[in-house]
């Protein structure tokens, strides 16, 4: 999915 917050995770 899209890395929210600019990191390599699917930010929540």
Swiss-Prot record:
Keywords: Blood coagulation cascade inhibiting toxin, Hemostasis impairing toxin, Secreted, Toxin. It is found in: Secreted. One of its GO terms (molecular function) is toxin activity. Its main location: secreted. Anticoagulant protein. May prevent the complex of factors Xa (F10) and factor Va (F5) from binding to phospholipid surfaces and to prothrombin (F2). Also blocks the activation of factor X (F10) by factor VIIa (F7) and tissue factor (F3) as well. This is Coagulation factor X inhibitor. GO terms for cellular component: extracellular region. Expressed by the venom gland.
């Amino acid at each position: 999915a899209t890395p929210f917050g600019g990191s390599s995770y699917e930010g929540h």
